[in-house]
């Protein structure tokens, strides 16, 4: 019912103007700006020409001729969620290889792979996650033929044909156990391959690359030049504390590397070192089981302890294909603050970890994942506290454009909600 009220009051005509940014305002709502602060009661947000103009207490909103959308009193408004390290847009059915572009294990190229060219904006997974409040995501391959996972891209989940926000936003490298498997069976081989690749990329940049003796393809060497020069972020997938220390040590030899740790299940053990190095972390929200030997020290308090040590931490939703659960993970981290002996996050910290922090790590700091003047008009209207599992989005805007929330799952829900079979197709009549 709330969803119908909001959409009707706003006068949204999606079919008539699917790509036009709308000028609108919401007032009298509980507002979360995504900057780590606590929610604002009786807040307001004003969006014009696809950008946020104002977000704060309703009493301070400037007068404007834009449409004021009427909403129920218990409505919450937040920036769109930012999902990072996902496979959104790269697959339809996991078990159908023709529809699954997440793996490239047989490709002769690795670091040169660019996922931005394969994004399918019509994917049902994009529509489902948009309906869950995710407005932007960083998409990567899950598997390649080497320790390098290729170049990830940042996308928006808007209902249009141009999803790419930032192509080739970052490079991925797998170290630890997974990297050891890909490099020949040992971490020793992993770090040798990694160091050699960086040297060859540096030689390529300096005009000293020898194609005959090089282990990298020319395309891979060229792709890694941006990493060596610090123009492209390097997402390093590691879990074990000793592997994290080894990665941090790389900056002593390659000072230009712009590192991001991904996973870091044992990050809490070396949190002061991570903070001192100024390296951000994308961590699974609630891993607490030793699924492997490199995760023996996993704990649900990992994120909270790293944040307390001064580490910039974004929350990943554990499964790359299900980032729609981000707000649930963030909410559980808030609940952890009430568990004796556990370390969680405040409400503001938890929401920032799924909005502004991943946006900043992905190169969109101040533009996405936040409701501040000048930011992109990615706005989500919720029927309650977004970190409570029972709350759902009732309206989603991306770049100020109202988005459809219908998807394959919602249509199935609506079709079979009623047990009346009178309107079923004749094929169902046995």
Language-model segments: which ranges?
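Gram-negative bacterial Sec-dependent N-terminal signal peptides
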Residues: 1-20
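C-terminal cap of metal-dependent C-N hydrolases
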Residues: 29, 33, 38-43, 360, ...
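His/Asp/Glu-enriched, well-ordered alpha-helical/loop segment
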Residues: 93, 100-105, 111-112, 233, ...
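Polyanionic/metal-chelating signatures
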Residues: 125, 130-257, 392, 429-430
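Catalytic beta/alpha-barrel core
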Residues: 235-239, 257-266, 290-292
